[in-house]
């Protein structure tokens, strides 16, 4: 079976081609803030990212012949983890999603490419809205704002299964804390194959990341909302997109930040240390959900 895999992220587009379990092509195309800023909305990147996929296939001499196409799942309605075929209902949910992120393009691009091939289905797997939370984890300090979780379920569950295989056991038999470090950062508690707690890594919970603010002081955020300084859309971008490292240092490029630290940039060192500190604190907190008994 020949499979095309498409993973659009906030700072990259990952592309792979597999013949059964053998990788024939693996590419990770990085995108700068400037490159993506020409598109007013994430959905406007559809043709750009789709054409990147086609260009990579052509550049590497891979014929456009596949048995299945799978894309990163979008921010549809909350669902349990698993593999889902893209259908009209999923496309509608994705196009009218309450939140925007590049992952919304994954299933749409997969379906568009698959539809041009005979008998080729399009799938998504473990989208970022996977919801397996314990009920106690949903409760916040305000009944107006129950916890929702948007996290890197695809990568986290893949890593969990790989770790289980390395340990000669099953994901469903392990208790794990897993952290995804990318444009956004998510920390989740996996108990016997279910992610019973995870932060909302997209719009305002957990550690700050290369392009997201993470948890912010609620009072100061309210004051900023009513200050008249920023519009609603501008405020949202200060939480996700133009926040975190890019707000402090003007870039999401961690290797470049490390290089500037090596050259004596003390501000960059402090900001990067602060991100690492917050990530470590979140991992430690997640371990308490399992009473410290982490495999």
Language model regions located:
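Short glycine-aspartate micro-motif
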Residues: 2-6, 66-70, 176-180, 186
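Short, well-ordered amphipathic alpha-helical segments that serve as non-catalytic structural scaffolds
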Residues: 48-60, 109, 159, 278-283
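Phosphate/pyrophosphate-binding loops at sites that engage ATP/ADP/AMP, CoA/4′-phosphopantetheine
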Residues: 53-67, 166-169, 283-294
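Short beta-strand-loop/turn "lid" adjacent to the catalytic site in phosphate-handling enzymes
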Residues: 57-103, 121, 129-141
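Glycine-rich phosphate-binding loop plus the immediately following alpha-helix
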Residues: 105-112, 124, 139-175, 183, ...
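Adenine-nucleotide phosphate-binding core of ATP-dependent small-molecule kinases
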Residues: 237-291
